[in-house]
C-alpha cells in the first residue's frame, strides 16, 4: 500500500524554519491587512488567528475592498491566574489597541482580544511581555493553554495542583526563538538542522492541537474528559499524592462526516506526582509519532487511540515513560459549574466569583463590567482567576476588604443580576461576526436563548434544576457542546442541531436528537421534554440522565460506534 500524502500544513511546518516563515515580512507589509496563506497557519503558533468582519463582507466586496481583516489574539495563562497589576495591563491593551474595546474570557481559562489590526499586533505582544504574559502556543499544533481547577476553597490543594499545571505548561512550550525574534526584536541566532531546536516537538510539531487539563475533584469545571490529556488530582489528608490520568478526549467533528466524532477520554490509571512530566511527554510524543498527518480531520489524539487500540497505546506510553500505571484511584466527579458569590477558603481568605455572560468583558449601559474589574484591580491584594466557564474569581480577599470589593462589583453590574441555575451553568463560543468557521450565531444570540430556557423551566416548575446548556456556531466544539445536557451546534444561519443526553458531571457525551432546526422548533421540543421531566423524573435525576432513561436519546457509550449510530 502506498504511503498517504501528508497534509499541506505538514510541509508548511517543515519549511517554516521553526515557525518563522515569512511572518516578519508580512507584518512589515502595508499593502494588505492580511498575511499570506501559509503564514496564516504559522501565526497560530504565535497565538493569533486572522479573521474578518463577516457582517461587512458583502458590503466591502461591492465596494471592491478587501475584507476588513483583523486578528484574534489569545494569551497563554496556565490555570487562568494573573495578578491585579497584570489585569490592568490586559485591560489597557483592550481599551487602546483593539477595535472591539473588550476582553473575552475563554472556555480554556484565558483571555483573548478581538478586532486587532495587523499594525497593532507587535505592540500588543510587547505590552503583554512587559506584564510577564505571552501568547506562545496559545493556538497551533502544540500543547495549548493548560487548564486547572481554580478551586477557591481548598487553597492548599489548589496551589499544589496549579504548580503542576504551570510546570506542564512551561515544560511543553516550543523551544524555537521565532516568537522572541519576530515580536520582541530578539537577535536571531544561527539555527541548526537537527532536532535539538525542538527536542520534544521536532520540526513538524504535533499533527494537531493538544489540550490538557488538571481537575481537582469533586469539581469538574475544566471538563477533564474532553481534553486530549487530563490529570484528576488524588489527595490524602488534603495533600496531593498523584493523579488519575485520562487521555483521548476532544470535541471537534465535521457535519456529515461520520468518521469524525467528539469523544471523552479513557481512564488509564494512577500516577504519582513526581511522574507527571514523564507521562505527559510520553503521551504527547506517542501522538507526535503515531498521529495522522495526512487527514487533519482525523489528527487528534482521540483518533490515534481509536485507530491503534487502547492497550497498544497504553503499553507504548508506559514504555516511553519508564513507569507503569497503577490502578485508578476512586474519586468523585461532580459539578462543572462555578461557585457564585462569596466563598471562604480554608486559609480564611475570601473569594468572589462573578458571572460574566459568555465571557465578554465590556462596558455597556447599566453594566460597566470592564471599568468595574479595572477599579477592583487597582485596590485588590490577591489575584484574578479566570474559570473555564468564562467567569472571573476575585481571589484571596481579606475579610476587612470584602465590603469594598463587593461595593465596586455591585456598582458596576458585576453583582446583583438575576442568575438562574441554568444560566450559571451555560456557555457559548464567539461565533459570528468574527469567527471564520461559524455557521450560525452563538455569543450574540445565547443570552436571549437562555431567557427562553429560563421561561420554560419556570413554566414547568423546574427552575431549581441546573441544566448544562451550551451553544457553538459550528461543530468544532470550542464551548464543549457535545458534553452538554442540551447542546446546540450551528448548521446554518438561524439553524442548529439539537443534542441531548450528556451527564451533568461531564462523564457521558450527548447525542443528536433533532437536525437543522430553528428556534421555534427547538423551544417546542424542549417545552415538551421539560413538561415530561417535571412529572416523570426520579428523585435527584438530572435532565441529561432523564432523556437517556426514558429513551429520548440513546446513551453514547463508545463514541466511535454510537455517537452517529
Curated annotation (Swiss-Prot):
It comes from the Bacteria. [4Fe-4S] cluster binds at residues 429, 435, 474, 478. Its EC number is 1.8.1.2. Binds 1 siroheme per subunit. It is an enzyme of class 1 (oxidoreductase). Its cofactor is siroheme; [4Fe-4S] cluster. Pfam families: NIR_SIR, NIR_SIR_ferr. The keyword Transmembrane helix does not apply. Belongs to the nitrite and sulfite reductase 4Fe-4S domain family. This is Sulfite reductase [NADPH] hemoprotein beta-component. It comes from Shewanella putrefaciens (strain CN-32 / ATCC BAA-453).
